[in-house]
Structure formats: structure tokens, C-alpha cells
Amino acid sequence: MGYGRSAGFGEIKMKVITVAAAIILNAQQQLLVVRKHHTACFMQVGGKLEPNELPEATMLREIQEEIGCEARIEKFIGRFETMAANEPDHQLVSYVYFVELNEQPHIDAEIAEMKWIDLDDTDTRLAPLTKEVAIPWVKKYLAEAVV
């Protein structure tokens, strides 16, 4: 007599967090990253979507809340899936935008640290989205801009 296997048995279902995230560069072609209070990894400015909020609106709201700036979305980069940096066993679904700031950023809201990093930075502990999506996109963007 065999044992039946119910659907989903043995599968691990990850929780999903949906966010909007910004790629912001300065004149020195450095990437802006922030670290929120009580977290270890630096990441893109951004945050979770509110109910019925479009990712573009989330992006502009989070930029204002986290770094106190007005901004303009230059380009939608894409929708990406990575592991969440600070929530174990969570998948991050990110709507990523290339953004231009209208003023100098400063720490606000839940941000503990903010810094501009070089694209080859190996000293800063970075979130998966920053390592796997943001930095490769910026390198490609800058290489194409030179041509």
C-alpha cells in the first residue's frame, strides 16, 4: 500500500514583498544607497507599495520620505525578483526606476545611513537587488552612454 502525496507537500512557499526602488546616480557616476535603522544591508531608496498605489507613485513618495527630495522618473528599468535583504525567507518583487533628483539628498524618516558608492565597491554590505540588478544595470547604462 502506497502513501499519497498531497499537492504542495514538501514545497516551501515564500512570502512576497512588492516594492518600488530607485537607481540614483551623482555626477561622479556613483550610486546612492541607504541603510534603514536596525538593518545591516545598504539598498536602493524605495519601499513597499501602499494598497492601490502605483509603483511610480510609491517611488516618488519614498524618495521624499527617505531622502527629502523631489524627483523625476527618467526611465522604468523593469520588474525584478530577488531575495529580500532584511526579511528571511521573503522574495522581493521590485519595480525599478532610473531617477533624477531635483536637489541634494539628506537622511530622513527611517534611514540610518546614506552614501554614494562606486560601482566596484566591495566594502559595503549590499542588498541582493543592489548587487544583482542596480549595479549591473548602471554599468551597462554607462558603457552604452560612452559609445
Tell what function each PLM region has.
Residues M1-K13:
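N-terminal amphipathic/basic-hydrophobic helices that include classical n-h-c signal peptides
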Residues G10-L31, K48:
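Conserved N-terminal beta-strand and adjoining loop/helix that marks the start
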Residues I17, Q44, A71, L92-S94:
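Short connector loops at helix/strand junctions that flank enzyme active sites
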Residues I24-L25, V33, V99, W116:
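Conserved hydrophobic "DFG−1" position in protein kinase catalytic cores
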Residues N26, Q30-E65, C69:
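Conserved Nudix-box catalytic region and its N-terminal flanking loop in Nudix hydrolases
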Residues C69-R79:
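A short coil-to-beta-strand element that immediately follows conserved catalytic motifs
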Residues E81-P105, W137:
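Active-site-adjacent beta-strand/loop module that shapes the phosphate/pyrophosphate-binding cleft
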Residues V96-F98, H106-K139:
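NUDIX/MutT-family hydrolases
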